[in-house]
Amino acid sequence: MSRLRAKLKNIACVVLLCTALALTYMVWSYTMGVSGMGLLRRAFGVEEQETALYPGYEEMSYATRAVTPLSCAVRAETGAGLYGTTDRETASACFEKMGAVLAEALETAEDPSPATSYQWRDALSGTMVFMDFGGKVPLAALARLMGAQPSESMQGAARYVVLAVEDGTAVLYYKSDDRTILRCRTEADAAYLISLAAEQTANGYRFAYEEDLADAREVLLLTPQTSVPEVTEHRVLDTSSESDYDRITKDVLEGFGFNAYMPRVYNESGGTRVYVEEERTLRVYADGHIAFQNPQEETAAGYAPDTEEQTARIAQAAQLAYGILSSYLGDAELFLLEAAYNEETERFCVRFGAECGGIRILGERRAVAVCEFFGGELETAYIDLVTFRRTGANTGIIPAAQALAAAPYTDGFGLYYRADGETVHAGWYVEKE
């Protein structure tokens, strides 16, 4: 009996020893490579999110909103009138309607070739859909956001896209500026495009070149409306109470992945408040500008992201920008201004602008949100906490012909809002890069 007890005791000791070793290994595996702050996050149930190559539904929905055109125009057939969208909402509805045939065009596009302004105008004069995205949208990323596999030919970016029917074939035209036009044949369903275009009723819109305006831009869309909304600009933090400031700051911190209750905080000159968590720094300036820094190792090497990674980075940036700004932009909406890789800095930069009623808002900084990625990591970001409100109707816009006659040049000429402090002026301006 004593021998049996001894054997059982030995077995129990071995089991306890193995259990202790297993628990030690589990704890070591769990904490390996994790800082003290990271362990505290885990203890409080706040797990850091790993960089995802394939964005989730929420990120994709934000990115899709960002690449919705600011305006669209549709012509049913040669000689027919033009249908134009009156704001971003109607442009979104038109874009959604044309989405399937556009996605098919992006998926089946052949190698692009240069086109002339005469070919561009011919395309606009026949059965077609015209889209102005407001910024330079990478076509491959646009295709992926629309659920399509982009053609290998779709490597560039475009602000203006036209899908036209020529000799029974759907042909894609696109341009990122006022000069370079590219054209490619596609296998998109031309008959379906014709049927969709026929559903739109002309509502008085015209392209400027149709009005015989001298040196008119081929992309300048003239509206029959005689007024545009008056818009005012307000800095979010200028009039916020202490409790509002704390709430806004909490939203911003959580938007950037900080634990709002744990970072180290100190003040700099000029009323700037600085939040530090590990290597990451967030500065909230008194005027409402937000600057985020997450320095990467100097020994790391950047690289040009492929189309999948570009789409993922755009989606990640869109989720961040919309998540922070959507509660404060007021009557304005974000749009993708640019998403491009800089070979010199080895950074992939995503910029968002603001529009109101489908009209771009120009300002000193051009972008209200900027995200810069090094490799797969968000390294720096800039957010402008600003609100735009419609306050009435502006009926003092001069005719386009007069504005064109007075313009120093036509590249970038269009109807914009220009933010100047608290005042936002609507008028004909030349957009500067």
Model region roles, listed by residue range:
Residues 14-17, 156-185, 190-196, 200, ...:
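Zymogen propeptides/activation segments of proteases
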Residues 20-24, 314-321, 368-370:
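Short low-polarity hydrophobic stretches
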Residues 15-312:
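Preferential activation on post-signal-peptide N-terminal prodomains/segments
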Residues 1-7:
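N-terminal Lys/Arg-rich, disordered targeting/topogenic segments
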Residues 87-109, 234-257, 304-345, 388-425:
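Short, non-transmembrane alpha-helical segments in secretory-pathway proteins
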